[in-house]
Amino acid sequence: MDFSFTPTPDKRDFLKEMGRSINDEVLKNKVDPIIGRDNEIRRLIEILSRKNKNNPVLIGEPGVGKTAIVEGFVRRVVNNDVPLNLRDVEIYELSLSGLIAGTQYQGEFEKRVNGILKQVKESNGKIILFIDEIHQIVGLGRNSSSGAMDIANILKPMLARGEIKVIGATTLKEYREYVEKDGALERRFQKILVSEPSQQEALTIMRGLKTRWELFHNLTIFDSALVAAVEMSARYIPDRNLPDKAIDLIDEASAKIKTEMASEPVVIDTLKREIINLETEYAALKQDKENADNKKKQGHLDNLKQQLDELKKKRDSLTAEWKKEKTNFESINKLKKEIEDLQTRLELYQTEGNYEAASKILYYDIPKLKNQLEQAQKKYVDSKHDLFKTEVSENEVAEVVSQATGIPLKKLLETEKEKLLHLGDEIKKRVKGQDAAVETVVNTVMRGRVNLNDPNRPIGSFIFLGSTGVGKTELAKSLAEVLFDNEKAMIRFDMSEYMEKHSVAKLIGAPPGYVGYEQSGLLTEAVRRKPYCVLLFDEIEKAHPDVTNILLQVLDDGTLKDSQGRLVNFKNTMIIMTSNLGSNYIMENKRDLAMEALKKHFRAEFINRIDEIVFFSVLQKTTVLEIITNLLDQLNQRLAKQNLKFTFDPKLNEFIYKSSFDEQFGARPIKRFIDRQIATLIAKQILEGIITKDVSYNVIVEKDKVAIVANKVKS
């Protein structure tokens, strides 16, 4: 009896198990077409046609289209638009995660890798491997306990002999960190640098993808939306690359409209809610009528019934129109999809040489469907009632950018136009006596909002010069509140905290090797999170010169790199710096001398980059009296929240002015006086039970002192 054992040969198809055929996906029209990138695809073909070192690796920043270049090459292979030596080749994308999954036993991983490489080698160049994120092959499969080799070392000998062809793709950073460290692996690949496309090239790529998006989302995308996506993404999303970021904007804007199309129109939804409210009221009144019959109530019920009938009739009519419009629109998209499928089959038949089937599609099927499409579009236009949006315009793209960045980019509504036109008046309600300064800042905001400012610089940069307490910081606060309805939209840096040279690290982050390197800088991180804001550098003259030097790049180019090398965009910020330099000259109305003091303290290149140097005037008596009235009104509002009724005697303003105002210290002593002399007195009397809620009080001046007089009123 023969007990010898003959092992069954392993017939597993490792390549199909752990990879995907890109050729099949192109044939099934699952891969988006690529327009452009001809130079990169030509270089890829040239490297693959070499005798040795015929393994290209695409290197570029994330989102520039490395994988799309490979898919574009495969499409050319499928269409026989490549040299003879590359015709009929099949490109498989290798799944590295699938390769390593379940390899718990020693030798299982090597078996899979060798099985794949054997299949590729035996194909005699007819199979090419594509490895996305190729840097991951370094160290993949290595086990320190078993001493197994990683996939990179298994590949090296076969790559060197030209037995297999591999296309790789990775980013510049990861190529440098992983592949370049292994010199033997690096020299087996030929680099193809994939740079970010220009705006015009990105627009061309997107125009090629437009039809695919329209068919997927069942809507129409205007060309103006594509242009807006490219321009806005380039300007407002600087930390990502074209065309990926522009594609994302169009995709999200389309998804937004698609969601709205799937939902009931707002007008029908509003009618339904109105009907529910009236039906509830009708049912309640009808129940009352049964208990106590009443002619007046009966008349009201009849009126409600009539309203309900009219609303239901309107709802049913609009619902029927909406469904009809939706059905017509869906039939258009169905025809478009059929035409696209026929175009794909036409290309396939032409490639295979089946000209009879190709001519039937070209001269009979496609013209027939195009004629049906034309009729369906005419029918849709005739029955259209604009109950739902079916188009993506630049406004939808702007809305997506606004949601992502917080920058208002939608077309100006009438209400916002009014707000901008009256911006100065709103700020002047808070900042008194500095009309020239307010106008300068407001004009800059208006230019920025209608995109007339230099797009490569911040919205505006100012130095506010003036003595303490004249409203420099208050103007910055009020600007943030009026523009963003929130004072917190202003990011404030007190420059007295940045008097040391090393404090630069606080703003942009600590350099490598120092404690806190992993943490982001206060300035750069704040602007990354809130790119549309007012930046206030309070008392800039107190900062160390090296701190002001880092602002040079911000003021000139609107960008700044943090310690991690990330580029932060300052182009949508308004930069305000306050200073007390030369305040004694400003008080004497000698502005030339104040400018000299500024020039002595700051370098010429710093001052030259500032848009406006704004002088704040000394507060006049009429202005101070207005400020006193404002402060007393604010105090009264706080008292009113506690249901306490107070009035202030007109003579009180003059008394506060004489008792507290000092030209040298500005308006701040006035606030301190009101807090100490009036607010404190009221607080004491509340605690003592003298002030109660059922009494109205008048704050007066009596014998050069503040006094509170009570008058009885009806509660």
From Swiss-Prot:
Q: Main site of residence?
A: cytoplasm
Superkingdom of origin organism: Bacteria
Q: Which SUPFAM superfamilies match?
A: P-loop containing nucleoside triphosphate hydrolases
Q: Where is this region: Linker?
A: 197-406
Gene3D superfamilies given in the database record: 1.10.8.60, P-loop containing nucleotide triphosphate hydrolases
| Coiled-coil annotated spans | 247-385
Protein name (Swiss-Prot/TrEMBL): Chaperone protein ClpB
- Which species is listed as the source? Mycoplasma pneumoniae (strain ATCC 29342 / M129 / Subtype 1) (Mycoplasmoides pneumoniae)
Q: What is the lineage of its organism?
A: Bacteria, Bacillati, Mycoplasmatota, Mycoplasmoidales, Mycoplasmoidaceae
* Name of the gene encoding the protein in the UniProt record: clpB
